[in-house]
Amino acid sequence: VSQIAGEPGSKDFVEVRLPAAGAYLSVLRTATAGLAARLDFTLDEIEDLRIAVDEACAILLQQAVPGSVLSCVFRLVGDALWVTVSAPTTDGRAPERDTFAWTVLSALAGEVDSSVADDKTVSIALHKKRGAGPGQL
């Protein structure tokens, strides 16, 4: 865990980079659970986040460039966890927001957003605050 300069102790971040392949997603699920536990999330909140991160990664892996790297940045800010997963993609399309997968993400993580960089890297950002019910910030 590293600290972001400027605000000692209030913003920590962890970055995990791994091959963009489903076989490695267990690493991110474990990291998600560990970091959410560090913020004293409930067991239900931890499980919701694990599933949300897994789903976000699954969405990205469908269009990831073969042999590329999946990046996951966790930011711990107060009683909230921000998770951003990103991968270079073949087509640079943002995930459709009217899909079942997006509905699941929104229900489990609270706030969900996506972006596409000029180099066709697609990112999905999740935000969950401790104590917020499903689908709430």
How does the language model describe each region?
Residues 1-51, 137:
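Bergerat-fold GHKL ATPase/HATPase_c domain
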